């Protein structure tokens, strides 16, 4: 994983979020920028993998900037990182923040067929191995017994 290291400050400062990817579905219906009057500051550098897209960049009253809206894809999943929000401040009551979260949920949804049983871990026989195989060593499971459940 990534260290996710960053600088931060709890000072209730103003945050201005700029939309940097106007055509992204997460930014649909949003103004070019919006402000949150009291927020916790996060500052660069931010130790995360390079995102697929950066949808928002924040500027804070103290002068710091931060990549506040990042997207990733992992296997069949879409992931959105959205920075604003602190237990001390009323961030989630802001209508624009609520719109971002709603858009992000819609964007992240993947209607593809789900894995029927994500805990299914079949114990396959050496008889169906691609190469000839001789069983060696102790066994934890009996032939045909399922593994992780």
Where do the PLM segments sit?
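Extracellular ligand-binding/catalytic regions of CAZymes and related secreted enzymes
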Residues: 61-67, 73-149
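Catalytic beta-strand/loop cores that center a nucleophilic Ser/Cys/Thr
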Residues: 2-76, 135
């Amino acid at each position: 994983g990534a260290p996710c290291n960053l600088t931060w400050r709890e000072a209730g400062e103003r945050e201005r979020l700029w939309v940097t990817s106007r055509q992204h579905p997460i930014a649909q219906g949003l103004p070019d920028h919006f402000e949150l009057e009291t927020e916790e500051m996060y500052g660069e550098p931010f130790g995360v993998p390079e995102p697929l897209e950066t949808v928002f960049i924040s500027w804070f009253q103290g002068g710091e900037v931060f990549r506040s809206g990042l997207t990733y894809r992992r296997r069949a999943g879409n992931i959105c990182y959205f920075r604003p929000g602190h237990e001390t401040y009323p961030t989630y009551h802001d209508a624009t923040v609520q719109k971002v979260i709603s858009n992000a949920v819609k964007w992240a949804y993947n209607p593809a067929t789900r894995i029927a049983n994500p805990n299914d871990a079949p114990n396959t026989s050496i008889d169906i191995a691609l190469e000839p195989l001789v069983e060696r060593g102790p066994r934890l499971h009996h032939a045909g017994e399922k593994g992780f459940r």
